[in-house]
From Swiss-Prot:
GO cellular component: cytoplasm
Descriptive protein name: Glucosamine-6-phosphate deaminase
Protein's organism: Clostridium perfringens (strain 13 / Type A)
PANTHER family in the record: GLUCOSAMINE-6-PHOSPHATE ISOMERASE
Family: Belongs to the glucosamine/galactosamine-6-phosphate isomerase family. NagB subfamily.
Reactions catalysed according to its record: alpha-D-glucosamine 6-phosphate + H2O = beta-D-fructose 6-phosphate + NH4(+)
Amino acid sequence: MRLIVTKNYEEMSKVAAKEMAEDIKRNPEIVLGLATGGTPVGMYKELIRMYNEGELDFSKVTSINLDEYVGLSGDHDQSYRYFMNTNLFNHINIDKNNTFVPNGLAENVEEECMAYDSRIQDMGGIDLQLLGLGANGHIGFNEPGEALSVGTHLTDLKESTIEANARFFDSIDDVPRKAITMGLGGIMKAKKIMVIASGEGKAEVVKAMMSGKITTEIPATMLQMHRDVILIVDEDAAKLLK
């Protein structure tokens, strides 16, 4: 696991964007696994800047997102499809037909999950998977538990995750309780994984991810078993690392 510690959130975002940009330039037909949440927003802004300045071409890129809330349509302003469109896709030249997010309104969730895994397989797998870290160690919506699912699946969100995401909704009661998420198996099959984390609130989980015991109670620790992980954090998130 490679570790890069940056001064602050802004620098972390720039370093992460540069890392992804280099991979896109090396492989214009790259399959990117993308994430949502507060952490990658700065990185996406930097990628948009690079595109606007002629440094990046997304026309042949395929993207596949980690997760989506169950019960929200893609045009709901808190859905992850909406998040990706407004924070990245609408501002670059990616073909929207080559951007994939689970369908939160799927009538048959089990079929949707199986189809999502088949799609990833048909693409030849994910070349670069971007991950944020939940304060409780979740990656995607793979929450702490006795067992972790391999494939894309329906999951019940932990109370701590619901509380953390409540800031995006009018009320905590509006936060969906279920989500479709890629499983640990799909994430671990990615050829390369880039993890980004910022702020003191992520320091404990960053420490556990780097050197803690591998346990399903902290899903991020599973990344220790992957052959190519780069962890990009700011000083606050790295403060418990020796």
